[in-house]
UniProtKB/Swiss-Prot annotation:
DNA-dependent RNA polymerase catalyzes the transcription of DNA into RNA using the four ribonucleoside triphosphates as substrates. Its EC number is 2.7.7.6. The keyword Transcription applies. The lineage of its organism: Bacteria, Bacillati, Cyanobacteriota, Cyanophyceae, Synechococcales. GO terms for cellular component: cytoplasm; DNA-directed RNA polymerase complex. It holds the Pfam family RNA_pol_A_bac. This is DNA-directed RNA polymerase subunit alpha. GO terms for molecular function: DNA binding; DNA-directed RNA polymerase activity; protein dimerization activity. GO terms for biological process: DNA-templated transcription. It is an enzyme of class 2 (transferase). It catalyses: RNA(n) + a ribonucleoside 5'-triphosphate = RNA(n+1) + diphosphate. The gene is rpoA.
Length: 312
């Protein structure tokens, strides 16, 4: 298999602390660049775990359509500003940040007090503007998750009336683009391809880490396929019929026929079912009269055997 290299050819950090990384992957066999690009993009955009604000409690407010005295932004604007926060929480449980401030003040993300397990990526993100003589008290809930989680309106009745739920966007990768270029090869050789990927994150993770995590998820997805073996199913043997389990003694054969069959290791009807008429004649001291006697005894219980052995 053709070995390829991965080079990060560009890395930029924007004013909002989002990061953009451009990676060059190649050379690849024809068609592999599309397969690799689509697979990585799918996992990067929807499969990585991230952190997001899931709920906000504002003192004195119990619904999102209210206004707060002395605050320029209404509640919906504050919720939207909190939803857009880029946050990285290392705690698998819910983290709660708190804000208690007096005006005049322009509240920014850095003013929210979290535990040491929560990092606010863009601390300059505005939250609200408070006028003199007024205050604002907030409680912000942060969780970890994957993908997009809309508010479940059915469960809102079980939550506190003043806890305002937010549609949570846990995706740390904001955008992924890729292009495919053909590389020059020697005359007569199969064409090669190069994959250029641009990964934009919200800053809570780097493009390098995002690519690595996506690749590891794909490895875990495909790893079981590498050990697939075809197990031949052994057909279950059908259970013998009640007639087949009848012992030889119950057929009421003559002493001569009975003794000959016993010497041939025939002990039940199931053993006889493996014989043909020709096979019976080959038993030592077993003539046609004895063979006919066995055939008649089997027919009385509804069993017949072939005249001649089946040729293989």
């Amino acid at each position: 298999m053709l070995q390829y290299q991965i080079d990060r050819i560009d890395h930029q950090i924007s004013d909002d602390r989002s990061q953009t990384g451009t990676f060059l992957i190649g050379p690849l066999e024809r068609g592999q660049a599309t397969t690799l690009g689509n697979s990585l993009r799918r996992v990067l955009m929807g499969g990585l775990e991230g952190s997001a604000v899931t709920a906000v409690r504002i003192s004195g407010i119990n619904h999102e359509y209210a206004t707060i005295p002395g605050v320029r932004e209404d509640v919906l604007d504050i919720l939207l500003n909190c939803k857009q926060l880029s946050i990285n929480s290392s705690n698998p449980e819910t983290e709660i940040g708190r804000l208690v401030v007096n005006g005049p003040m322009e509240v920014k993300a850095n003013d929210i007090q979290f535990s040491s397990q929560v990092e606010i990526v863009d601390g300059e993100k505005p939250i609200a503007t408070i006028q003199e003589g007024h205050n604002l008290e907030l409680e912000i809930h942060v969780e970890r998750g994957v993908g997009y989680r809309p508010v479940d309106r059915r469960n809102q009745e079980t939550t506190a009336i003043d806890l305002l739920q937010i549609d949570a966007v846990f995706m740390p990768v904001k955008r992924v683009n890729f292009t495919i270029d053909e590389t020059a090869v020697a005359e007569g050789a199969t064409g090669r391809e190069r994959l250029t990927m641009e990964v934009v994150t919200d800053g809570s993770t780097s493009p390098d880490d995002a690519i690595a995590e996506a690749a590891n998820q794909l490895i875990e997805l495909f790893q079981p396929l590498a050990t697939v073996t075809m197990v031949e199913e052994i057909p279950e043997e059908p259970e013998p019929s009640p007639e087949a389990q009848i012992p030889l003694e119950e057929l009421n054969l003559s002493v001569r026929a009975y003794n000959c069959l016993k010497r041939a290791q025939v002990n039940s009807v199931s053993d006889l079912m493996g014989f043909s008429y020709e096979d019976l004649l080959e038993i030592k001291n077993f003539g046609s009269k004895s063979a006919d006697e066995v055939i008649e005894a089997l027919e009385r219980i509804g069993i017949s055997i072939p005249q001649s052995r089946t040729s293989v």
